[in-house]
Amino acid sequence: MKNPMLEAVSLVLEKLLFISYFKFFSSGAPGQDKAGNTLYEISSFLRGDVLEVPRTHLTHYGIYLGDNRVAHMMPDILLALTDDKGRTQKVVSNKRLILGVIGRVASIRVDTVEDFAYGAEILVNHLDRSLKKKALLNEEVAQRAEKLLGITPYSLLWNNCEHFVTYCRYGTPISPQADKFCENVKIIIRDQRSVLASAVLGLASIFCLGLTSYTTLPAIFIPFLLWMAG
């Protein structure tokens, strides 16, 4: 039997992480910085390498397959609306991506390095050092990625691009950045001042907007949720 409280907390976490994900893809022109300079050298990438695109809030991951091709997981609402590969294989727009996150539908797809990077620099195999895990052979990594190509369920917390890459590279799907996000939120929740602050904001909204269902319910539910989870 599912725990309603845990489901509610999970939903809140996913919505907060979604905001960061939206900011991740809100700027940049594929493959170049503002001065038009290329931020990476494709010839230095090896088949099976993990490519990382660091941003302010999140890092996007992919597996290099060779020949300027990168396999990566991308949310895309169009996958739930049409089977036309001519449309779904086009570069995923921000609108398609955001709705895909909400709809929890994605695909592990192949794009060019330029489209994958989306205007940012690329780090190579940085996870090997940060996770201190032994990587599989590069060819096995690439083959694992190729076998997973296609539509897949999506979750910012439980099945994202980092889970895909770590499974291919190390054999175990993990997402340190999602775990870190949850830990930070947990710290905030455990701080009882968060309960007081949310209660004050709730009362302020009732005072300013009046006693209605859309002000009263959040004013009661959010402090209660933080108190129970703390």
Curated annotation (Swiss-Prot):
Cytoplasmic compartment segments: 1-194
Localization terms from the record: Endoplasmic reticulum membrane; Rough endoplasmic reticulum; Endosome, Multivesicular body; Cytoplasm, Perinuclear region
Stored Gene3D superfamilies: endopeptidase domain like (from Nostoc punctiforme)
EC number(s) reported in the record: 2.3.1.135
Pathway assigned in UniProt: Cofactor metabolism; retinol metabolism
Record-annotated active site: H60, H72, C161
MF GO annotations: phosphatidylcholine-retinol O-acyltransferase activity
Induction: LRAT activity is up-regulated by dietary vitamin A. Under conditions of vitamin A depletion, LRAT expression in the liver is induced by retinoic acid.
Main location: endoplasmic reticulum
Record domain LRAT: where: 50-177
Record keywords, A-Z: Acyltransferase, Cytoplasm, Endoplasmic reticulum, Endosome, Lipid metabolism, Membrane, Sensory transduction, Transferase, Transmembrane, Transmembrane helix, Vision
Transmembrane residue ranges: 195-215
GO BP: retinol metabolic process; visual perception; vitamin A metabolic process
InterPro entries xrefs: LRAT, LRAT_dom
Lumenal-facing ranges: 216-230
Catalytic activity: all-trans-retinol--[retinol-binding protein] + a 1,2-diacyl-sn-glycero-3-phosphocholine = apo--[retinol-binding protein] + an all-trans-retinyl ester + a 2-acyl-sn-glycero-3-phosphocholine; 1,2-dihexadecanoyl-sn-glycero-3-phosphocholine + all-trans-retinol = all-trans-retinyl hexadecanoate + 2-hexadecanoyl-sn-glycero-3-phosphocholine; 1,2-diheptanoyl-sn-glycero-3-phosphocholine + all-trans-retinol--[retinol-binding protein] = all-trans-retinyl heptanoate + 2-heptanoyl-sn-glycero-3-phosphocholine + apo--[retinol-binding protein]; 1,2-dioctanoyl-sn-glycero-3-phosphocholine + all-trans-retinol--[retinol-binding protein] = 2-octanoyl-sn-glycero-3-phosphocholine + all-trans-retinyl octanoate + apo--[retinol-binding protein]
Activity regulation annotation text: Inhibited by all-trans-retinyl alpha-bromoacetate and N-boc-L-biocytinyl-11-aminoundecane chloro-methyl ketone (BACMK).
Membrane topology value: Single-pass membrane protein
GO cellular component: endoplasmic reticulum; endoplasmic reticulum membrane; multivesicular body; perinuclear region of cytoplasm; rough endoplasmic reticulum
Function per UniProt: Transfers the acyl group from the sn-1 position of phosphatidylcholine to all-trans retinol, producing all-trans retinyl esters. Retinyl esters are storage forms of vitamin A. LRAT plays a critical role in vision. It provides the all-trans retinyl ester substrates for the isomerohydrolase which processes the esters into 11-cis-retinol in the retinal pigment epithelium; due to a membrane-associated alcohol dehydrogenase, 11 cis-retinol is oxidized and converted into 11-cis-retinaldehyde which is the chromophore for rhodopsin and the cone photopigments.
Family: Belongs to the H-rev107 family.
Identification of the protein by name: Lecithin retinol acyltransferase
Organism lineage: Eukaryota, Metazoa, Chordata, Craniata, Vertebrata
